[in-house]
């Protein structure tokens, strides 16, 4: 029984050593003198074993080897009459079981892309005159700055949604129509600057999603103070989604 230690020195070529022990049984028989007396004896034991060799892989299963083995002190002079050493030089072939190709594990699935959403809010009082949907020069300048930011983002397979909002002053239907017209004006301007038309859309939200309280306004005409208080509700939001 021996342990084998190998070291590669070239492709498919290893040198190795084996160290261990060999269990042996020795038998002896002898005839003595004129009487013809026959004597026999036997002994068993374990002797140290050492070997060195080279092994060449012919295929992934078959290999050939040249091996030199030395076993020390086999037997006992007191029982079998001798205690020789044993050496052996051998050339052989071997077959290795379990050498099938290793199947690499399937790669882990790629993580799902993270959809990032950014929101830009512009005041309608900067973009438009009161109750109008045409952009003011100041509004165009604000959109020019926004376009620069959108261009630097360069979203992959992204989309832009422009949402128009009004305050609650006036009739619901009129506010809805105004919010749609203002959102469309912003979309048209950004498309003229270079945003692909199939990547941007407009949506009028009317009086939805107010960001302030009523500021004391109930219905009818609003006071100047109420109009100023309700200003944050008059806005255009640009929602940018990209991967």
UniProtKB/Swiss-Prot annotation:
Chain segments annotated as transmembrane: 1-8, 13-21, 48-57, 62-69, 88-96
Species for this entry: Serratia odorifera
Family that this chain belongs to: Belongs to the outer membrane OOP (TC 1.B.6) superfamily. OmpA family.
Intervals holding Sequence repeats: 104-105, 106-107, 108-109, 110-111, 112-113
Function: With TolR probably plays a role in maintaining the position of the peptidoglycan cell wall in the periplasm. Acts as a porin with low permeability that allows slow penetration of small solutes; an internal gate slows down solute passage.
Site entry (Part of salt bridge gating mechanism), positions: 65
Record flagged with keyword Transmembrane: yes
Keywords: Cell outer membrane, Disulfide bond, Ion transport, Membrane, Porin, Repeat, Transmembrane, Transmembrane beta strand, Transport
Domain OmpA-like: 115-243
Protein's cellular compartments: Cell outer membrane
Record note on quaternary structure: Monomer and homodimer.
GO MF term (any one): porin activity
GO cellular component, one term: cell outer membrane
Listed NCBIfam families: PRK10808.1
Cited InterPro entries: Bact_OuterMem_StrucFunc, OMP/PagP_b-brl, OMP_bac, OmpA, OmpA-like, OMPA-like_CS, OmpA-like_sf, OmpA-like_TM_dom
Gene Ontology biological process terms, A to Z: monoatomic ion transport
Domain notes per entry: The extracellular loops are most variable in sequence, and in some bacteria confer sensitivity to phage and/or colicins.
UniProt protein name: Outer membrane protein A
Membrane topology label: Multi-pass membrane protein
Disulfide bonds: 215-229
């Amino acid at each position: 029984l021996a342990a084998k230690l190998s070291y590669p020195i070239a492709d498919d070529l290893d040198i190795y050593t084996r160290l261990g022990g060999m269990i042996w049984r020795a038998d002896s028989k002898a005839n003595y003198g004129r009487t013809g007396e026959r004597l026999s004896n036997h002994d068993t034991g374990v002797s140290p074993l050492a070997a060195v060799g080279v092994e060449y892989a012919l295929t992934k299963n078959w290999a050939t080897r040249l091996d030199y083995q030395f076993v020390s002190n086999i037997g006992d002079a007191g029982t079998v009459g001798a205690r020789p050493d044993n050496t052996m030089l051998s050339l052989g072939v071997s077959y290795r079981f379990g050498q099938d190709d290793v199947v690499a594990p399937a790669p882990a699935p790629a993580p799902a892309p993270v959809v990032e959403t950014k929101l830009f809010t512009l005041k309608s009082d900067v973009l438009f005159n009161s109750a109008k949907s045409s952009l003011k020069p100041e509004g165009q300048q604000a959109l020019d700055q926004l376009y620069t930011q959108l261009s630097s983002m360069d979203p992959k397979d992204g989309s832009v949604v422009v949402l128009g909002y009004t305050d609650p002053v006036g009739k619901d239907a009129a506010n809805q129509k105004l919010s749609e017209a203002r959102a469309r004006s912003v979309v048209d301007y950004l498309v003229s600057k270079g945003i692909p038309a199939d990547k941007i859309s407009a949506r009028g939200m009317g009086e939805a999603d107010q960001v302030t309280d009523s500021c004391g306004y109930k219905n009818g005409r609003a006071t100047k103070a109420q109009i100023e208080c309700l200003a944050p509700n008059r806005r255009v939001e640009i929602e940018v989604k990209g991967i």
